[in-house]
Amino acid sequence: MKKFLFLLALGLYLNVASAQNSKSITGIWWNEEKTSKIEVVEQNGKYVGKIVYMIPEKYENGQPPKDTKNPEESLQNRSILGLQILDGLTFNLDEKQWEEGHIYDPKSGKTYDCYAWFDGSTDKLYLKGYVVGIKWLGKSTEWTRTSLN
């Protein structure tokens, strides 16, 4: 009976620990160039991210830049500030990474499949965007944990 209770407690602990690990991606992140901050949150079991801050030097005529590179003409007038650029990431416990997501690059107007991971510290988030299903054909970037202010 003691062994059963111990295993039950251990199982519950590991389940809680893995759930906390999956949420470690949430928070505010500087992009690699330190021109934008992205907030990553959990939404319906998946992780999404939107641009919540842009350095003023990126503003055009005092306004945040528009999504002019978007291939959909109807979306080219929307602001990049507030734009969701990351969606659909789900945590893979075995691989210890977030997978099956998409990342939008407002500089090019292209959307890529992506996955994300930590390499030791949870202060640096690594993301790799790649062309449909070909993970080796892509580009990695590094985001740094920060705060909104």
Where does each model-flagged region fall?
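Short, compact, well-ordered microdomains
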Residues: 123-126, 140
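Short beta-strand segments that buttress and anchor functional surface loops
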Residues: 29-31, 99-106, 127-130
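A mature extracytoplasmic/lumenal domain signature
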Residues: 42-44, 51-53, 118, 129-131, ...
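Central antiparallel beta-sheet cores of small beta-barrel/beta-sandwich binding domains
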Residues: 41-113
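Tryptophan-anchored aromatic micro-motifs
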Residues: 22-36, 51, 100, 143-145
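Bacterial Sec-dependent N-terminal signal peptides
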Residues: 1-21
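Edge beta-strand at a domain terminus
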Residues: 131-149
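Short, surface-exposed coil-to-beta transition loops
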Residues: 34-37, 84, 109-114, 136-140
